[in-house]
A protein has these predicted regions:
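Conserved ATP-dependent adenylate/AMP-binding module captured primarily in the ANL superfamily
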Residues: 115-132, 166-179
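Short glycine-enriched loops at secondary-structure junctions
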Residues: 88, 111, 138-141, 187
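Residue-level signal for inorganic ion chemistry
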Residues: 33, 94, 133, 182
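Short, flexible loop segments at the rims of nucleotide/cofactor-binding pockets, characterized by
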Residues: 110-111, 137, 158-162
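Active-site glycine/GP-rich loop and adjacent strand/helix microenvironment
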Residues: 1-32, 155-222
Length: 222
């Protein structure tokens, strides 16, 4: 089995080492997925995915679009499952802002991957066990906020659920609990700022030092 991460060492990883690691991991993933996943097998049937020679070969691979995944889903199940349904332990779905929501099933290993991704995000933001993180979400089936909330708990910080609260209530909760980090979508973070202005709440006086945004393209724009 291919290693799940590059070995830790003091000197930087070279580009060649990184690409070799990625290729090895991808080959292992394909060996597991293609025999079990009819959607992926059909999608990659014309590119000899089982004979991937280099990462450059990926330039010839077809894109997979969200519309295809939504169309393949039926009876609440994704159309691209690799394992039997009983192996999955978590259900989430996309927000449905643009069309029908896309169901997402995760195994325990999948969820561990989510947590590893969030570990990197929290590291980059300098989030520590001393932080108090207000998660401004309705806590419906949207995966992003559930994963972020659990990652804060794993970090040892205080994860503050603000589900089911009006925007003003969330601002008041952030103030009363001295939240140091806000987690929200970009558009909702801007909406909170507008509500604060309407109710004459001085955002600069709040202890929030970091805003982590997700779920919309704005989160990737510096």
């Amino acid at each position: 089995m291919a290693p799940s991460a590059l070995p830790e060492r003091s000197e930087p990883v070279t580009r060649a080492e990184l690409e070799a690691f990625k290729l090895d991991r991808l080959r292992g993933l394909l060996r597991d997925v293609l025999p079990q996943n009819a959607f992926c097998a059909a999608k990659l049937s014309r590119v000899a995915a089982d004979r991937l020679a280099s990462l450059d070969d990926l330039a010839e691979w077809p894109f997979t679009f969200k519309e295809e995944l939504v169309a393949a889903a039926s009876n609440g199940l994704p159309g691209n499952l690799t394992w039997p349904p009983e192996r999955y332990v978590r259900f989430h779905q996309t927000s449905g802002t643009h069309g029908r929501p896309l169901p997402v099933f995760d195994t325990r290993d999948d969820w561990a991957w989510w947590m590893e991704c969030w570990r990197v995000i929290l590291d980059r933001g300098g989030v520590t066990p001393d932080d108090r993180v207000l998660v401004a979400s309705s806590f419906g089936p949207y995966a992003g906020f559930w994963s972020g909330f659990e990652a804060v708990i794993d970090r040892g910080g205080l994860a503050i659920s603000a589900g089911g609260m009006p925007s003003l209530g969330r601002l008041q909760l952030a103030r009363s609990l001295a939240a140091t980090v806000l987690m929200a979508t970009p558009s909702y973070a801007l909406h909170l700022a507008e509500v604060a202005e309407e109710h004459k709440i001085d955002l600069a006086a709040l202890p929030v030092r970091l805003v982590i945004v997700m779920g919309e393209p704005g989160g990737s724009i510096p």
